[in-house]
């Protein structure tokens, strides 16, 4: 089957038309406008390509999903989370989990070269698109701070009651997992059931993520995005999933 080439005004083809080799590739071209990205994510499609390539659009089958109720931290991570929770009421806790205080820095860290990887899919154009989505209140970061330094985190897209995870990074062991645990608590409190993880990896599976048939995934997101989105604000998350809004200046040591 020939890969469809999208002009700016061309709608996406049905996700059932995605190729089997490479698995999930649906189309190429178009742009990264907010309208295009919203249409993509609302239909189970995401962009993934390298610098110098055209924009490639994917909808793999099955789709990796973390059901918030199935989040499964390891014994050591649970122990660390309990320790952080005990200390979070201190005047200046050593570890804080924050929302949207350093979105650009989180994206930049996620895009940085990693051992064993030749390049990054988070191209300059993708970073610009995410920053625009963040300015529009749709893209968000969850950040783990240790002793006033950004130690790890993640970012993703929030549409209604659906969260689409994009990427994670860590400078300190388990820092990104701590951010994920706090995100899960926040989303569960807001009635969000699923986090889209896009592609299957052992790392995600170890945390409770599972493959879901694409048809079921698309059906779920179309219902979920019709619901109200969580009340995202810049501030601090606690271990129970409550977001405490605060100016960035009051959070920095």
Swiss-Prot record:
- Asked whether the UniProt record includes Transit peptide among its keywords, one would answer no
Q: Of which family is this protein a member?
A: Belongs to the L/F-transferase family.
Annotated EC: 2.3.2.6
Q: Which UniProt keywords apply?
A: Acyltransferase, Cytoplasm, Transferase
Entries under SUPFAM superfamilies matching the protein? Acyl-CoA N-acyltransferases (Nat)
Chemical reaction(s) catalysed: N-terminal L-lysyl-[protein] + L-leucyl-tRNA(Leu) = N-terminal L-leucyl-L-lysyl-[protein] + tRNA(Leu) + H(+); N-terminal L-arginyl-[protein] + L-leucyl-tRNA(Leu) = N-terminal L-leucyl-L-arginyl-[protein] + tRNA(Leu) + H(+); L-phenylalanyl-tRNA(Phe) + an N-terminal L-alpha-aminoacyl-[protein] = an N-terminal L-phenylalanyl-L-alpha-aminoacyl-[protein] + tRNA(Phe)
Pfam family of this protein, just one? Leu_Phe_trans
* Top-rank taxon: Bacteria
- UniProt GO molecular function: leucyl-tRNA--protein transferase activity
Matching InterPro entries, A to Z? Acyl_CoA_acyltransferase (IPR016181), Leu/Phe-tRNA_Trfase (IPR004616), Leu/Phe-tRNA_Trfase_C (IPR042203), Leu/Phe-tRNA_Trfase_N (IPR042221)
Localization, per the record, is: Cytoplasm
A GO biological process of this protein is: protein catabolic process
Decide whether keyword Nucleotide-binding is in the record: no
Write the protein's name. Answer: Leucyl/phenylalanyl-tRNA--protein transferase
Gene that this sequence comes from = aat
**What task does this protein carry out?**
Functions in the N-end rule pathway of protein degradation where it conjugates Leu, Phe and, less efficiently, Met from aminoacyl-tRNAs to the N-termini of proteins containing an N-terminal arginine or lysine.
Q: Name one GO cellular component term.
A: cytoplasm
EC primary class: transferase
Taxonomy of the source species: Bacteria, Pseudomonadati, Pseudomonadota, Betaproteobacteria, Burkholderiales
């Amino acid at each position: 089957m020939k890969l469809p080439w999208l002009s700016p005004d061309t709608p996406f083809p049905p996700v059932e038309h995605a190729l089997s080799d490479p698995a999930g590739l649906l189309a190429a071209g178009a742009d990264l406008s907010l309208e295009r990205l919203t249409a993509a994510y609302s239909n189970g499609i995401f962009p993934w390509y390298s610098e110098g390539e055209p924009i490639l659009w994917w909808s793999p089958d099955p789709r990796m999903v973390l059901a918030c109720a199935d989040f499964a931290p390891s014994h050591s991570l649970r122990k660390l989370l309990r320790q952080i929770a005990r200390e979070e009421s201190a005047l200046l806790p050593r570890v804080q989990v924050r929302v949207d205080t350093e979105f650009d820095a989180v994206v930049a860290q996620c895009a940085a070269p990693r051992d064993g990887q030749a390049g990054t899919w988070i191209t300059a154009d993708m970073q610009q698109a995410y920053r625009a989505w963040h300015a529009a209140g749709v893209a968000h970061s969850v950040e783990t701070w240790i002793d006033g330094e950004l130690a790890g985190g993640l970012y993703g897209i929030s549409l209604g009651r659906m969260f689409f995870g994009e990427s994670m990074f860590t400078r300190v062991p388990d820092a990104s997992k701590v951010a994920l645990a706090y995100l899960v608590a926040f989303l569960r409190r807001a009635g969000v059931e699923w986090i889209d993880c896009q592609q299957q990896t052992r790392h995600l599976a170890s945390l409770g993520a599972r493959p879901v048939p694409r048809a079921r995934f698309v059906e779920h997101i179309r219902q979920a995005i019709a619901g109200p989105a969580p009340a995202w604000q810049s501030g601090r998350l606690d271990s129970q999933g409550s977001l405490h809004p605060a100016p960035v200046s009051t959070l920095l040591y």
